[in-house]
From Swiss-Prot:
It comes from the Bacteria. GO terms for cellular component: cytosol; glycine cleavage complex. The glycine cleavage system catalyzes the degradation of glycine. Belongs to the GcvT family. This is Aminomethyltransferase. The keyword Zinc-finger does not apply. Its EC number is 2.1.2.10. PANTHER family: AMINOMETHYLTRANSFERASE, AMINOMETHYLTRANSFERASE, MITOCHONDRIAL. Keywords: Aminotransferase, Transferase. It catalyses: N(6)-[(R)-S(8)-aminomethyldihydrolipoyl]-L-lysyl-[protein] + (6S)-5,6,7,8-tetrahydrofolate = N(6)-[(R)-dihydrolipoyl]-L-lysyl-[protein] + (6R)-5,10-methylene-5,6,7,8-tetrahydrofolate + NH4(+). GO terms for molecular function: aminomethyltransferase activity; transaminase activity.
Amino acid sequence: MTALNHTPLNAAHRALNARMVDFGGWDMPVNYGSQIEEHEAVRTDAGMFDVSHMCVVDFTGSRVRAFFEHAIANNVGKLKTPGKALYSCLLNPQGGVIDDLIVYYFTEDFFRVVVNAGTAEKDIAWFNQLNEQGGYGLTIAPRRDFAIVAVQGPNAREKVWTTVPAARAATSELKPFNAARVAGTPFGELTVARTGYTGEDGFEVIVPAVHVEALWTALQQNGVRPCGLGARDTLRLEAGMNLYGQDMDETVSPLDAGLAWTVDLSAPRDFVGRDALERDGTRAAFVGLILQKENGKAGGVLRAHQKVVTPHGEGEITSGTFSPSMQESIAFARVPAAVHVGDTIHVQIRDKQLPARVVKLPFVRNGKVLAA
């Protein structure tokens, strides 16, 4: 049996009596007691997540922009100011999603990328292959000397500034999807990004791994609640945010995963997967579902891989959960393209087909329920 990878915060999680699980080969906290309370902390105050299993990768070289113009489906031409971030899919030549990632632009010869934990080695091998094939001459460096803490919620930024006063001046004017580098902190040089995976405001803080436990402890002392993967999943699902490996993978086009907005076909770029996307187009709709109640009660919970039955053919739930914010069973589903918002479809739950309403994503954003 292969030993699990540990983040630099593993001992801190165990000291807090976290319930630990194997998450893609990493020993990670699923909760620290009450998943519901952790979820609510992020929606109403501030919570923090150890996301150090994700991998920071630095790209340096004079042709780094040209490399990303070819490597990813979104357009790095949008990255003009230092610290600007871009969410994109990394595609294979067949148009399938190798990973979803965030690219940060700092200078014309330095970009930084954060990739998912379970795909990191595959991604880096693919980046190296593209670099070599295209003769870009980049240095591609995985930075396992960094850890990442995501601090999320309406009070998250203020609590980060209380904990790291030097970050206030550098990040108080930061717009969403921008990052700043903050030097001179007790926790080393930080990269603080106004990004997240919860549908709330907040920061994702890249910190030297040797200092992350001190940062985590200081944030907790300033009222930021530790949160596990359980709350992270309910929060991201409410926020309409995809999970790689569930909602899309190498067999699924971003156009069939609700990610058409991350694909830029307008610019004349020869990016990997473009030909396949233009040839195949959109073949399925990616929608939100809310399970209907009978006599005030839902007949089950929507879960991944449940069959969806529509007048236009069958589909499948890709992610599902009980929403603490809505008190409803919610899901993402890939369904025939003729299915539209407002339709009622049916989900196979055990031996029953239960009605569910098709809604526009997201379900919840900034503490407000949007789907009805």
